[in-house]
């Protein structure tokens, strides 16, 4: 009998979030009386196409997450909690090592992005099955300048070609594993998973995301995040075009 393919999400929550100005990990800050990380995990917990979640947290926080988030809120799809590394790519690599052989598609998502929607997740999985590699992104709204070390403008790229990349980033598992193996072999670095996949020779497709899918990074983001939750409770979707 053939083994059914799985869709796994690696939720990366190992960063300390120094820009938040807190003494503890930003993913544990409360929104609506629940940790940000809970809100993120709950989206994937409720998604019918997600079979399991691998949660990557800062070293030493594994037991806390098991007790205070996973067990406390009854999250059944979190199969494994693993310690992250010194950099994001190390944390993702640790998560990849926990993938089961049956996993065909893997999503990588920031633990501090709790406002991703079911619809965007579904579309990104669909495209990943078809194309192999996909990122979620939105067109930039502002004019972007390249600036040198003297604080001089050196270039103004065409805004129509610029997209702000979010997560999840979604791949056939074999593609992402190969990209990370080559990154290790050739000492490649990148700020996201797609950079490593591109460097390995794959084409990465783009799925249109939503502007609400912010990464909660600064105190101001908490205010915006509360506004998003309030809008959603009222059955609305924020339109910040």
UniProtKB/Swiss-Prot annotation:
<comment type="function">
    <text>Catalyzes the formation of 4-diphosphocytidyl-2-C-methyl-D-erythritol from CTP and 2-C-methyl-D-erythritol 4-phosphate (MEP).</text>
</comment>
<feature type="site" description="Positions MEP for the nucleophilic attack">
    <location>
        <position position="215"/>
    </location>
</feature>
<comment type="pathway">
    <text>Isoprenoid biosynthesis; isopentenyl diphosphate biosynthesis via DXP pathway; isopentenyl diphosphate from 1-deoxy-D-xylulose 5-phosphate: step 2/6.</text>
</comment>
<dbReference type="InterPro" id="IPR018294">
    <property type="entry name" value="ISPD_synthase_CS"/>
</dbReference>
<feature type="site" description="Transition state stabilizer">
    <location>
        <position position="19"/>
    </location>
</feature>
<dbReference type="GO" id="GO:0019288">
    <property type="term" value="P:isopentenyl diphosphate biosynthetic process, methylerythritol 4-phosphate pathway"/>
</dbReference>
<keyword id="KW-0548">Nucleotidyltransferase</keyword>
<dbReference type="InterPro" id="IPR050088">
    <property type="entry name" value="IspD/TarI_cytidylyltransf_bact"/>
</dbReference>
<feature type="site" description="Positions MEP for the nucleophilic attack">
    <location>
        <position position="159"/>
    </location>
</feature>
<keyword id="KW-0808">Transferase</keyword>
<feature type="site" description="Transition state stabilizer">
    <location>
        <position position="26"/>
    </location>
</feature>
<dbReference type="GO" id="GO:0050518">
    <property type="term" value="F:2-C-methyl-D-erythritol 4-phosphate cytidylyltransferase activity"/>
</dbReference>
<dbReference type="InterPro" id="IPR001228">
    <property type="entry name" value="IspD"/>
</dbReference>
<keyword id="KW-0414">Isoprene biosynthesis</keyword>
<dbReference type="Pfam" id="PF01128">
    <property type="entry name" value="IspD"/>
</dbReference>
<protein>
    <recommendedName>
        <fullName>2-C-methyl-D-erythritol 4-phosphate cytidylyltransferase</fullName>
        <ecNumber>2.7.7.60</ecNumber>
    </recommendedName>
</protein>
<comment type="similarity">
    <text>Belongs to the IspD/TarI cytidylyltransferase family. IspD subfamily.</text>
</comment>
<dbReference type="InterPro" id="IPR034683">
    <property type="entry name" value="IspD/TarI"/>
</dbReference>
<dbReference type="InterPro" id="IPR029044">
    <property type="entry name" value="Nucleotide-diphossugar_trans"/>
</dbReference>
